[in-house]
Amino acid sequence: MSIDDKVRAIVKEFKAYVPGKSKEEIARNYGIDPEKIIKLGSNENPWGCSPKIAEKLMNEVSNLHQYPQPINPELMDEISKFTKMPTENIIVGGDGADEVIDNIMRILIDEGDEVIIPIPTFTQYAISAKIHGANIKWAKFDEENGFKLDVESVLNNITEKTKVIFLCTPNNPTGNVIPTEDIKKIVESTDALVMIDHAYIEYSKGEYDLTNWALKYDNVLVLRTFSKVFGLAGQRVGFGVTSKKIVDYMMRIKPIFSLTRASQVSAITALQDKEFFDRCLKEGIESREQIYNGLKKFKQLEVYPTEANYMLVKVKNGMNSSEFCEALLKKGVIVRDCYSFEGLEPYYFRISIGTFEENERFLKIMSEIVE
C-alpha cells in the first residue's frame, strides 16, 4: 500500500493555493534586477512597517530561545485600544487571519455541514472549509452589477445545516464594500456564524467598519489583520473580534505558541506608532487614486471602483489575463492574475498600491502594452 492510499480523498482533489509572485521569483525567471521590479500583486503596504520595529526586534533577539507568551497582555491591550473593543472579545492568531478562519472551522464544522461563500472572493475560505469536511454553497458578487453582493443568493442558500457565512468587505479581489443594510439582513436572518472579513477596512469609509457588531450580535466574528496598513505581512499577525463564548471555544483548540515573540513585539510597536499608521493610510489612499485615475485613461481596460488598497481590472484588448500579466512580468511588473479566483472569467487582474514613483513607472509600462 502506498502513501497515496492513505491520503484523504478531499486532499487529493485540492489544487495548491496560488499566492502572489515574489520579486525573487521574477528576478530568477526573467533575469531582471530585483531592485527594478515593481511588486504590485500582494496587497502589501509599499512603505513597509514602522521604522521603530527594527530597534525593538534587535532588543528581542536575546530572548528568542524562550517560548512566546500564549496570550500577550500588552498586545491585547493595544488591540483593544485600537478597535475600542474589550480584550475578552478578541482572539489573536499567527499565520495572519488564516489561523482564525481555520480555528472557526475546527470548532464549528462537522462532516456534511454547510458554509456559504459568495464568489469571487478570498480563496482561503473555501480551502479551509473543504479540508474540515464542509459542503460549500456558492453565492455571488454579481459581475453584471459591478460585483455588488447578490443578497438573495446568500439568503436562498441558508438551511438548517448552515454553520458559517463568509462576507469579505471590502471584498478581495473586487475591492467593493458590502452595504451595511445587506449584511444586517443576512446576520439577522440566521443563527449561523457570519464571518465579516475586514482585512482592508482601514482603507474604506469609517461607516463601513462593523467591528463593534461583535458586541451587538452573538453570531458575528470580525476578522482583522496587521498585514495591510500596518505593513506586517511577513510577521503573520491577525485577530478576530467576536462573542466571549466563541473566543472561549477557540482558545480551547488554538495552537499554543503560534504567534512568535518577534511577531508580538512587531504588532505592539506598530499599534503604538500611530503617526506612521496615519501616514501610510493617507498616502495609501492617495496612491490608490493615482493608479485608478491613471488606468481609467486606457480604453482597453475596465477599472472597478475600490475601497481597498488594490483594484480589479478587466482586460479588453483581446488578451486574456494570463497573457496580459505575462507581458507585465517581462517588463518587471508584478500584478495578480485572477484566473485562480472561483467565479471570475479569465480576463481579470488585480493591482495593489505602490509608492508614487512605482505607480508612475507602472502606468508608463502599461501605456506601452495597451496602446
Curated annotation (Swiss-Prot):
Keyword Amino-acid biosynthesis: yes
Listed EC numbers: 2.6.1.9
Residues with PTM N6-(pyridoxal phosphate)lysine: K228
Pathway: Amino-acid biosynthesis; L-histidine biosynthesis; L-histidine from 5-phospho-alpha-D-ribose 1-diphosphate: step 7/9
Molecular function, one GO term: pyridoxal phosphate binding
Needed co-factor(s): pyridoxal 5'-phosphate
Keywords: Amino-acid biosynthesis, Aminotransferase, Histidine biosynthesis, Pyridoxal phosphate, Transferase
Catalytic activity: L-histidinol phosphate + 2-oxoglutarate = 3-(imidazol-4-yl)-2-oxopropyl phosphate + L-glutamate
Any GO BP annotation: L-histidine biosynthetic process
Enzyme class of the recorded protein, top EC level: transferase
InterPro entries in alphabetical order: Aminotransferase_I/II_large, HisP_aminotrans, PyrdxlP-dep_Trfase, PyrdxlP-dep_Trfase_major, PyrdxlP-dep_Trfase_small
Keyword rRNA-binding: no
Family listed: Belongs to the class-II pyridoxal-phosphate-dependent aminotransferase family. Histidinol-phosphate aminotransferase subfamily.
Protein name listed in UniProt: Histidinol-phosphate aminotransferase
